[in-house]
Amino acid sequence: MYLESKRAPAVRACGLTRRFGRAVALDGLDFSVAAGQVVGLLGRNGAGKSTLLRIVSGQLRQTGGEAELMGAPVGMETLGRLCLIGDTPDFGGLRNAGEFLAVCRCLFPSWQEEQAGRLMTLFGLPLKKPLKGYSRGMQTALLLCAGLASGAELTIFDEPSLGLDAVMRERFYDEVVAAHRREPERTFLISTHLIDEVARTLDYAVMIDGGRLLAQGSPEEMTRLYLCVSGSAEEVGAATAGLAVLREEEVAGTLVRYTRLNAPEDAERIRACGRVQTAPVSLQRLFVLLTEGKEAERDAG
């Protein structure tokens, strides 16, 4: 659970821009993430997530704007407080997991040896088996174990579910929640396009699309002003009069309308009508609705 503090933001971007020739990967991105949370960086493949992570980890320089970690510009001082687990396993010629963990022990000042051992057992990873004999899922799990046990003030996982089966993915998310409960001062940032899968884990979410900020806030804050309303066209129209419509479709003769509320109280008013059915809008569905809206705006422009 997120505990408010006066610490500097874990990650802050101000007008952050990155161009590759004529291609714009980040387009004036602005957001701020408070420290001590489990944060989701959510977006489609190609949205700019990996470019952003390369900038905040010092692997890539921005074209314009500012990027800060823990209140300071990205640099050697901030990178010493960061652990970035990328989406492509690369063990640099190390022979086995034991050698890899020995390197991690030297890299991270707050390395948690006991946790590392427990996680290796939990994910069924043998220390002495050659890494070339590890499956892709095992290699990914080894990296995730290192991130969890790093003790780093800011720990970032880029597409952590790649190669993992459903059981191992759920196990990983459970371990992130447990680690944050033990160490509430740490910030965990999970970059992914699998929004429904990670939603239950998050205290805060940053949605980006086309290199721009789409929305940010806690999952509850972001979804509470959206509602799915279904029924006859006449009843749905009456119940949602005066509200913005993001999308509507007809399913088996029933009109399904996704709407943006003017205030949370609108949901109770609609439910009180008794003539329509309502359902909350998931974080995944909200992302789809917002990206569709942005695409419609671009097409209209």
Model-flagged regions — what are they?
Residues 64-78:
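Conserved ABC transporter NBD signature motif
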Residues 2-4, 244-247, 251-301:
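C-terminal coupling/interaction segments
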